[in-house]
Amino acid sequence: MKRVNKKIIGVLVLLVSIGSFYLLKQVQKHGKTSQQETKQKYIDAKTEKPTIHVFDDNKFVFVAQKDGIGGIAFGQDYISVLDVHQKEINQSMIDREKNGSPKIAKDEYFNIISYDLNASGFPSKKTEVYQLLGKKEYRGAYDISQYYADNKDYIPVTLYKVGNNDSRKIIVDITNQKIENLENFEDNGKSTFSAAEQELSKGNVYNNIRQAMKEKYHLKFTAGYIDTLLSKEDREKIDISNTNFAQDYPEMAKDIKDLARLYMRPKQYSTKEWFDTVLHWFAPKGQDVLEVYATDPKTGEKTQIKSYDELQVWSANHTD
């Protein structure tokens, strides 16, 4: 009987030991998890060099981006992307008040990589925004766009202050790699091509060509550039194999599903040339123009428009 009791006690001691060991491991594991959760997250935003073509007397630029959408700024002299390694910005008001924002670590950086459209092979140069700012008091937001003025390309950057995350905006001169006063750019953000959209809107032609490009090719037309619709399904459906563009530029046509943007450079831009060129590029192979129509707002009568000049004549004869 005593021998049996000893066995039972031994088993109980063993079970308690195993349970204690398992509980200790769970506590240690939980402690590690908690430490990891409180550790500040890093954000890495890096866009690899896209495929670039500058063509037709250097007036047009075709940019393709493999396996991705966005993160590219399109300019006159440069195509720019971000290369960022920094701690996560608490952008919500609750997170700002609760957690603030930690000091910038030595390994953090916010760089703009720009590819020169005027040089063979499109070599890159790096603009180190933290270095331009001098004091490491701000982190940059991870979005990028480009702005062209005074024959130079600029990148607007939104910054968040270390500590309270108050925001401010700067504008970076890519050509000279320096920060400019944002107040000198009051029209920053306005489209270079907004006036052109108004020109092409007469007779609903602008919407008509947008609809034709979407339905036929799953591409998005705007005044000054063409890019893809956002959904992956639309990108997979893109097919321009039977167009004049594919016949004239087969090397670019094969990358069309990865299109980031096809655009006319701002300095060379003219609404007439852009409109006439797109009508020819995206016409069925061998035809002169893509079919688009102007609609009389009073009668509903449709008239095919084959050129910018024809649209001007139609507009003059259909004044309100």
For each feature predicted by the language model, list its residue ranges.
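N-terminal Sec-pathway targeting helices
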Residues: 1-14, 24
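Sec-dependent signal peptide cleavage junction
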Residues: 20-37
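Surface-exposed loop/turn elements that mediate protein-protein interactions on large endomembrane-trafficking
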Residues: 35-64, 95-136, 167-274, 281-318
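Blade-terminus and WD-like Trp-Asp/Gly-His loop motifs, strongest in beta-propeller folds
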Residues: 72-75, 146-151
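Residue position within the beta-strands of beta-propeller blades
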Residues: 81-83, 157
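Short, solvent-exposed, Trp/other aromatic-anchored flexible loops in extracytoplasmic proteins
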Residues: 136-149
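Acidic/hydrophobic-patterned starts of short beta strands in beta-sheet-rich repeat architectures
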Residues: 152-156
